[in-house]
UniProtKB/Swiss-Prot annotation:
Chaperone keyword on record: yes
Gene Ontology terms: cellular component: cytoplasm
Protein name: Small heat shock protein IbpB
Matches recorded under InterPro entries: A-crystallin/Hsp20_dom, ACD_IbpA/B, HSP20-like_chaperone, HSP20_IbpB
One Pfam family named in its UniProt record: HSP20
Lineage: Bacteria, Pseudomonadati, Pseudomonadota, Gammaproteobacteria, Enterobacterales
Gene coding for it: ibpB
Domain sHSP: 26-137
């Protein structure tokens, strides 16, 4: 029997909360850059990438169809450095996310080495569930209305 870990895959799909029950498979985890995906409520999400050492000019965010892509290319250093220990990574990266229908980027800002990308779900009013009022006092379809006496 095979066990599938969907968590690495689901991190790449934003706004598909019921995706786990309909998908099988796995994907190699992405380890750079580290990121969080927050669900604030049913219509608001935030992706936060930890990008210490990057500048805002090193980053590019692009949306094409349902695909959100974040690219980073750090500027080359002018002098060679001999590291005794290198724990900080400065390497180019490309990170892509597939957005659910009606989900779009509302804001992006870079502050203190963190890139925040805010997402909002805007479902058109025609597609939103509508509440139907339940009336009373009407006869059923198969019954004749009572005659006034």
């Amino acid at each position: 029997m095979r066990n599938y870990d969907l968590s690495p895959l689901l991190r790449q799909w934003i706004g598909f909360d019921k995706l786990a029950s309909s998908m099988q498979g796995s994907q190699e985890p992405i380890d750079f850059p580290p990121y969080n995906i927050e669900k604030k409520d049913d219509n608001h999400y935030r992706i936060t990438l930890a990008l210490a050492g990057f500048r805002q000019s090193d980053l590019d965010i692009e949306v094409e169809g349902p695909r959100l892509t974040v690219k980073g290319s750090p500027a080359p250093t002018e002098k060679a450095v001999e590291y005794l220990h290198q724990g900080l990574v400065f390497k180019p990266f490309t990170l892509s996310f597939t957005l659910a229908e009606h989900l779009h980027v509302s804001d992006a800002h870079f502050e203190n080495g963190l890139l925040h990308i805010d997402l909002v779900r805007d479902v058109p009013e025609a597609l939103q569930p509508q509440r139907i009022a339940i009336g009373g006092g009407r006869p059923a379809l198969n019954q004749q209305p009572a005659e006034d006496a």
